[in-house]
Amino acid sequence: MILTVTLNPCIDRTLTVSNFREGGTTPVSATRTEIGGKGLNVSRALKNLGAPTLCLGFSHEKGGSDLKATLDEAAILYDLEAIPGELRMNIKIFDESNRTMSELNDKGCRVSEEAVNRMIARIVSHFKDAELLVLAGSVPPGVPTDIYKTLLKKAQTFDLPVILDASGALLLNGIEGRPWLIKPNIDEFSATLGREFHSREEIIQAAREIVARGIPYVCVSLGPDGALLIGEKEALYSPAPDVEVRGLQGAGDSLVAGFCLAFHEHHLKGEKLSETPAVQNTKLDESGCSAENSESEKKTELKADAPTFMRSLLRYAQAAAAGSLTKPGTAVCERVDFDKYLPTIQVEKAGEFFDVRREDGNLTGEVKLRSLVHRDGDWHGTVHMWVADRTPDGKCRLLIQKRSQDKDNFPGYCDISSAGHLDAGDDYDSAAYRELYEELGIRAEKGDLRFCFFITRSVETEFHGQKVIDRERAAVYLYEKPVDLTKLHLQKEEVDEVFWIDLEELEKILQDPTAKYCVYKEEIQGIKKYL
């Protein structure tokens, strides 16, 4: 069951106009009156999408019967706390000429402390049977601005994930309760943090700083420019769906419903949100020495499917939002709309996050977007895995990968057997096992990768007209188990083909500065000592 909380329900009266004149008279072409509130609208969308939902919140003495009638008509389950006062009314002015929405929102009637405490108890009573909780929207006078933080702390005792859709103090305080996902729009995000953003990179970096505080996902909706979803390892971007916009107000609530639906479908399948093959491996200290301790006996999960789940989250959210945009007023998406738009939703990588290191490999404690690391020349970690064997006549040979022709940099060049960056939170060893599996399909067992040495390099170049300063501290490994090239599974985005090359021949090739090889002579000289 997906719980939604609406502490400030309302009557939304939407006026559709053309060329709205502030301070003047503007004819109204259509009016639409709906009872709603952010959490209630999320429940309405979830009901349309076929997901189980229970609506929780306040019900006012005046207007409360209409609120219940609306939920009954939609066959939405609810458990509401009755309070004195009148259901507030909000005025929405949708201008068809420029697709903008102006809002006049009433703050609502004051709520007593006793009613707040009863409401908290009522909400918490449903936690034991819930799979997900949505806290959304404003709160009326009398409700403390840390109410969402309070509910988040209580949800933690039930291991109940929470989506928080709020702004201002409600969002800032709520972040301290570590929700599973937050969803401010760009204006709310900017106002809440007290910062102006001049690029997508700045938005992503600010969101990643919030992720570092223990929040798995931050979604920043960009209105007509699409949406960003930022997690621990990477950031994703989805452009706004190409639809005829008839209403804006229900899109944000439908977006949240899309996140809920993606979560619900994974929950039904019994899938972990980052479920992948695990390997055990030996930890290395920064000098490269084996550090055999209890930590080295733990399993390190390769979170290869976490990005896949992130993409599902964003695709579902954008498809649900698209379905709402085609409807007037505050109407939310229908299942038929969701199914129609889901195949059209595009999601692309907007960035990866690296731990910033010192030249000696020690962490600075800062996490930055990959593009900013390369812009600022920050030291970061990489792993180089050389696959080696010997021919029947005893000659040593190394496996070379030919980089994909679709790569942005050095397409078609010959490169290390397998290599990759350390994502934020990675250690060298787990990154090495992961990259070897992702790029070549080699599932190494504990101890199969032999650490050899660290190598540092600093290169300044220009890429797409931008100065790039690449400062890497790479851990170099050897993999010497038998390898059947016909059974490798190459990562298409990274590798076109692989082939063996004699070590002596490779050394000769690297004497030629024009050779299309991304391999350093110094590294090969170092590897020779271990072969």
Listing of model-derived features with the role each one plays in the protein:
Residues 1-56, 64-66:
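Glycine-rich phosphate/adenosyl-contacting loop at the front of the ribokinase-like
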Residues 146-234:
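Conserved phosphate/ATP/ADP-binding segment of small-molecule kinases
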Residues 24, 48-130, 339-346:
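Conserved N-terminal subdomain of the carbohydrate kinase-like
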Residues 349-393:
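Acidic, metal-coordinating catalytic segment for phosphate/diphosphate chemistry
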Residues 172, 200-348:
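Conserved phosphate-binding/catalytic region of the ribokinase-like
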Residues 400, 417-452:
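The catalytic Nudix box helix
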Residues 382-418:
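A glycine-rich, hydrophobic loop/mini-helix early in the fold
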Residues 412, 453-464, 468-531:
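Nudix hydrolase/Nudix homology domain
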